[in-house]
Amino acid sequence: MSSSWIVGLLAFLVSLVALTQGLPLLEDLDEKSVPDGRIVGGYATDIAQVPYQISLRYKGITTPENPFRHRCGGSIFNETTIVTAAHCVIGTVASQYKVVAGTNFQTGSDGVITNVKEIVMHEGYYSGAAYNNDIAILFVDPPLPLNNFTIKAIKLALEQPIEGTVSKVSGWGTTSPGGYSSNQLLAVDVPIVSNELCDQDYEDFGDETYRITSAMLCAGKRGVGGADACQGDSGGPLAVRDELYGVVSWGNSCALPNYPGVYANVAYLRPWIDAVLAGL
């Protein structure tokens, strides 16, 4: 058996893994859904309001004739570095992605398009708890032309947000469970929920692996619902005053009163991010 044939087979298997693990679906979790950044109860916004937001577009290895399609969101850290969710990129390779910045839409060729050259996924992803350490760093080339208007870097949080602080989540996707995705960039404002309360809310969700860890933070209108991130755009930003506090990760369905959205905790994961960047 030739080595080239083996490489081709491995690439095909990786592509299959990506379809099942890269974007978890409702049926994958026995009627437990994983928010991937779909905005529920939000409003149309302009990229100038969230200029750090990017569209991460994907194409399967076995379908090179297909166009790159929006898969996840992400945030610009600097001209060559994007922060996104680990579950967006697990089982895939860099050449399957392009990053589009400075656009209001998840389709089309407006905005600035660049290539993903390297993916660094947290080595502790899913260790100890479902979706634990759900973060990844993408390196792109050519560099993004930052302009402080539609393409702008965002600072990474160093401290935990205070409970009740209103945060902004942005992204593309459907506006209701099972609905159609939005081509227009959307945003929603949600208050931070303490990890203690969030863990109580998720106590009866799934098995014991679905718990809230220090590597996560929660946000949502607890007891009210109606506003949340959800399936369709994982990896997108949760920001407070133009500072990145969270990366859209998972949760139970969308905008339910007693199930806040769960995000990767940027402040807690900052040492890992800094170590990755220092290793360049």
Curated annotation (Swiss-Prot):
Residue positions assigned to the propeptide: 23-38
Enzymatic reactions: Preferential cleavage: Arg-|-Xaa, Lys-|-Xaa
UniProt KW keywords: Disulfide bond, Hydrolase, Protease, Secreted, Serine protease, Signal, Zymogen
Chief place of localization: secreted
Annotated S-S bridges: C72-C88, C198-C218, C230-C254
GO MF, any single term: serine hydrolase activity
Catalytic residues in the record: H87 (charge relay system), D134 (charge relay system), S234 (charge relay system)
All residue ranges annotated as the Peptidase S1 domain in the record: 39-278
A Pfam family reported for this protein in Swiss-Prot or TrEMBL: Trypsin
EC number: 3.4.21.4
Similarity remark: Belongs to the peptidase S1 family.
Protein name per its UniProtKB record: Trypsin zeta
Biological classification of the source: Eukaryota, Metazoa, Ecdysozoa, Arthropoda, Hexapoda
